[in-house]
C-alpha cells in the first residue's frame, strides 16, 4: 500500500503547484523575499520605518457556503477573489494597507486544474488589493470530504501608522455617511440563498431579465474590494472618521460596530439603488425587509463617515478609484445603533 492508495495523491499536489505558479508570481511585491516553495513566506518591513508608530493589522475569513455555488456551476476562478476581499476589506476599513495574503484550500481530492483555477482567483484578489500572495496550503482530506468538494479560507496582514488608524473615536454628530456600491450578495448569507433558490445547474443557468444575467452569474459575482477606494480617499487628504465593512449581519450588526457611544447612524434607504438580486431574493423567499437588512449588504458593501466639509472630495476620490459612492445618511447624537428610514 502507498499514500496514493489511501487517497492522497502527492503527484497531483506537485502538478497543482506548477499550474498555479504563474498566477502567484503576478502578485509579487519588491518586499517579498525568496522564491516559491519555501517553508515560510518572507516579507521585508523596511519601508514601514518611515512610519512613526507602525501597527500590523490582520484578518482571516472564508467564503462561507458560496463555495457550494461555485461547485455546482463548476466555475472556480472567482471564488478566490471573495476569500481575499473578506480579509483585506476588514483591514482597509481600519485604515490599513494590505501587505500579503496566504490561502488555505481543503479538498476531498486534489484535481490540479481545479485547484489552480481557485488560486487564479486568489491571485486576482491580491492584485486588486496590491497584496502579495506569499504562501498557502492545499490539504487533501480523503474520507473527510467528498472528492468533488472543497473549502477555501485565507489570512491577510496589513499595516498602518497608528495615528492614521480608523477607530471611530473622531465620529461626531453631523458627519455624513457615504456608501460604496457592492457587486451583489458578496460572501455572506448563502445558506439562506440556497434555501430560497433551487441550487441545480439548470436553475442557476436560468436568465433573469431584471438581473441582466443568469441567476448563477449574479450570485457568484465576486465581492468588491475597496482597498484602492480607501487609499484614494486618504491620498485626497480626507480623514475618515469611521468605516464599516457590510458583511454577515447586514446593516443592523455591522454599522453599530463603527460607532462610538453616544452616536447613532441614520441611513436613508431611498438614497441609493437596492440591487435587483436582493429584490428577487426577498420576493422568491418571502423575506421581510428587516431580515434582508439584517442579513445582506443590500447594495452597499462598505459605509464610511466623514466630516460634512469633506463629502465632495470623498465622493470624487471614490469615483477616481473606480467605485460608485452614494451619500446615504448621517451621524446623530443618541443611543448607539442604526436607524433605517
Tell me what each language-model feature is.
Residues 1-31:
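N-terminal amphipathic/basic leader segments beginning at the initiator methionine
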Residues 2-6, 114, 118-129, 145-152, ...:
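Glycine-/charge-enriched secondary-structure boundary and capping motifs
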Residues 9, 61, 174, 245, ...:
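Residue-level signature of catalytic and energy-coupling elements of molecular machines
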Residues 17, 116-119, 190:
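Hydrophobic face of alpha-helices
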Residues 20, 42, 87-88, 193-196, ...:
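Buried hydrophobic packing segments
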Residues 22, 28-183:
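Glycine-rich phosphate/pyrophosphate-binding loop regions near the starts of catalytic domains
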Residues 51-56, 62-64, 168, 202-205, ...:
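Acidic-glycine-rich active-site phosphate/pyrophosphate-binding loop
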Residues 173-217:
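Acidic, glycine-rich loop-and-beta core segments that form the ion-binding/anion-interacting portion
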Amino acid at each position: 500500500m502507498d499514500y496514493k492508495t489511501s487517497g492522497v495523491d502527492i503527484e497531483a499536489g506537485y502538478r497543482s503547484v506548477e499550474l498555479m505558479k504563474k498566477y502567484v508570481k503576478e502578485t509579487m511585491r519588491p518586499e517579498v523575499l525568496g522564491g516559491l516553495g519555501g517553508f515560510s513566506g518572507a516579507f521585508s518591513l523596511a519601508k514601514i520605518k518611515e512610519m512613526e508608530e507602525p501597527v500590523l493589522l490582520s484578518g482571516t475569513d472564508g467564503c462561507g457556503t458560496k463555495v457550494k455555488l461555485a461547485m455546482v456551476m463548476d466555475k472556480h476562478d472567482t471564488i478566490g477573489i471573495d476569500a481575499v476581499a473578506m480579509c483585506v476589506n476588514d483591514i482597509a476599513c481600519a485604515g490599513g494597507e494590505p501587505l500579503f495574503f496566504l490561502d488555505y484550500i481543503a479538498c476531498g481530492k486534489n484535481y490540479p486544474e481545479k485547484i489552480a483555477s481557485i488560486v487564479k482567483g486568489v491571485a486576482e484578489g491580491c492584485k486588486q488589493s496590491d497584496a502579495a500572495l506569499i504562501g498557502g496550503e492545499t490539504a487533501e482530506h480523503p474520507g473527510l470530504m467528498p472528492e468533488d468538494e472543497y473549502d477555501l479560507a485565507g489570512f491577510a496582514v496589513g499595516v498602518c501608522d497608528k495615528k492614521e488608524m480608523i477607530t471611530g473615536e473622531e465620529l461626531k454628530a453631523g458627519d455624513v455617511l457615504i456608501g460604496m456600491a457592492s457587486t451583489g450578495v458578496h460572501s455572506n448569507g448563502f445558506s439562506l440563498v440556497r434555501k430560497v433558490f433551487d441550487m441545480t445547474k439548470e436553475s442557476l443557468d436560468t436568465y433573469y431579465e431584471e438581473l441582466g444575467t443568469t441567476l448563477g452569474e449574479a450570485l457568484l459575482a465576486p465581492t468588491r474590494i475597496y482597498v484602492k477606494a480607501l487609499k484614494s480617499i486618504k491620498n485626497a487628504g480626507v480623514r475618515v472618521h469611521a468605516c464599516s465593512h457590510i458583511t454577515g449581519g447586514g446593516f443592523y450588526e455591522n454599522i453599530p460596530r463603527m460607532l462610538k457611544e453616544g452616536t447613532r447612524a441614520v441611513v436613508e434607504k431611498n438614497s441609493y439603488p437596492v440591487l435587483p438580486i436582493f429584490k428577487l431574493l426577498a420576493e422568491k423567499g418571502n423575506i421581510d425587509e428587516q431580515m434582508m437588512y439584517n442579513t445582506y449588504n443590500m447594495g452597499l458593501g462598505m459605509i464610511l463617515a466623514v466630516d460634512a466639509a469633506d463629502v465632495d472630495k470623498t465622493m470624487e476620490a471614490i469615483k477616481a478609484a473606480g467605485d460608485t459612492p452614494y451619500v446615504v445618511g448621517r451621524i446623530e447624537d443618541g443611543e448607539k445603533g442604526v436607524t433605517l428610514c
